[in-house]
């Protein structure tokens, strides 16, 4: 049927293979809170991850069984999903994940790649980058741009003790005394996120 509306990305796989791929990506996302994959896979996995977190917020027996059918290791991840992650997103109406475009993963595969991450978590990339920008602005004694202020509001709005955690991160980054926005990757490990 030519010209039909595409409801989802097929990812050049059979239906069973595609479902297995997405379940594996979502299981890794819940386990590690961030994954690096291709952009189309990240966007499709994002849809399934959002549904899974919405199920965890319902916290019913039916929701637990549905989540158990999605995750590959439910015995390990259901307590995390229905505990820590459900509490983190209790007040957030949606948008539990974020897709950030990145450079291709290696020089041989030029497929567009992306990072899929859970927002407001300990590995939130936008939170860290916004804090680094604010720390740089304060170090250089310049006013933050409107975009930086908007991002600051976004990353702290639904986070528990958001502004306090953000200011702690900014203080940690200022103590590193980085120059021109460049931070040694070894210094990131010293941050207590």
Curated annotation (Swiss-Prot):
It comes from the Eukaryota. Keywords: Mitochondrion, Ribonucleoprotein, Ribosomal protein. This is Large ribosomal subunit protein bL17m. GO terms for molecular function: structural constituent of ribosome. GO terms for biological process: translation. Component of the mitochondrial large ribosomal subunit (mt-LSU). Mature N.crassa 74S mitochondrial ribosomes consist of a small (37S) and a large (54S) subunit. The 37S small subunit contains a 16S ribosomal RNA (16S mt-rRNA) and 32 different proteins. The 54S large subunit contains a 23S rRNA (23S mt-rRNA) and 42 different proteins. InterPro entries: Ribosomal_bL17, Ribosomal_bL17_CS, Ribosomal_bL17_sf. Component of the mitochondrial ribosome (mitoribosome), a dedicated translation machinery responsible for the synthesis of mitochondrial genome-encoded proteins, including at least some of the essential transmembrane subunits of the mitochondrial respiratory chain. The mitoribosomes are attached to the mitochondrial inner membrane and translation products are cotranslationally integrated into the membrane. The keyword Mitochondrion applies. It is found in: Mitochondrion. Pfam families: Ribosomal_L17. It comes from Neurospora crassa (strain ATCC 24698 / 74-OR23-1A / CBS 708.71 / DSM 1257 / FGSC 987). Belongs to the bacterial ribosomal protein bL17 family. The keyword rRNA processing does not apply. GO terms for cellular component: mitochondrial large ribosomal subunit. SUPFAM superfamilies: Prokaryotic ribosomal protein L17.
